[in-house]
Amino acid sequence: MAETKKMIILKSSDGESFEVEEAVAVESQTIKHMIEDDCVDNGIPLPNVTGAILAKVIEYCKKHVEAAAEAGGDKDFYGSTENHELKTWDNDFVKVDHPTLFDLLRAANYLNISGLLDLTCKAVADQMRGKTPAQMREHFNIKNDYTPEEEAEVRNENRWAFE
């Protein structure tokens, strides 16, 4: 007899509903706590996550739950063993445009999914590596709101960072 898996409904900020296995949903500590507090009867509203981003988050969680199951249920397998296929998949997963990457980062933070948060933060850090402050501002479309005097003061106080 086939085992039926408990399903959870997740509702995005733009009204989309996603039916997800509980094992996948609890990759999010935020959702896990809502389930533990019995707050799932009518679905779990996620007001800070759009449907498009929630679909990507679910894809990430599903992939990692499946990979952990293949590794014998060891959730720490990613760091303790060489799982090149998953690492490659993760690297490809964050090859998205800037707005999507930042939305994924915000969703990972809001949903408290540590693996996804680490992955998205690393992707942003990798984009910053080797760039000057001016190049980073241009790359991330950040306005420089320092006066030349303020910028010189910051550079002087933090000389070690500019060497």
UniProtKB/Swiss-Prot annotation:
Where, subcellularly, is it found? Nucleus
Q: Which Gene3D superfamilies match?
A: Potassium Channel Kv1.1, Chain A (3.30.710.10)
Where are the annotated segments for Interaction with the F-box domain of F-box proteins?
Answer: 105-163
The answer on whether this UniProt entry bears the keyword Cell membrane reads: no
Pfam families, alphabetized: Skp1, Skp1_POZ
UniProt KW keywords: Nucleus, Ubl conjugation pathway
Q: Which CDD domains match?
A: BTB_POZ_SKP1 (cd18322)
Identify the metabolic or biological route this protein is part of.
Protein modification; protein ubiquitination
Q: Establish whether keyword Nucleus is in the entry.
A: yes
Top-level taxon of the source organism: Eukaryota
* Gene Ontology BP, a term: jasmonic acid mediated signaling pathway
Question: Which InterPro entries does the protein's record reference?
Answer: SKP1, SKP1-like, SKP1-like_dim_sf, SKP1/BTB/POZ_sf, Skp1_comp_dimer, Skp1_comp_POZ
Q: List, alphabetically, the GO terms of the cellular component aspect.
A: nucleus; SCF ubiquitin ligase complex
Q: What does this protein do?
A: Involved in ubiquitination and subsequent proteasomal degradation of target proteins. Together with CUL1, RBX1 and a F-box protein, it forms a SCF E3 ubiquitin ligase complex. The functional specificity of this complex depends on the type of F-box protein. In the SCF complex, it serves as an adapter that links the F-box protein to CUL1.
Subunit and interaction comment: Part of a SCF (SKP1-cullin-F-box) protein ligase complex. Interacts with ADO3/FKF1 and At3g61590.
Q: Which family does it belong to?
A: Belongs to the SKP1 family.
Name the record gives this protein: SKP1-like protein 3
The scientific name of the source species is Arabidopsis thaliana
This protein's encoding gene: ASK3
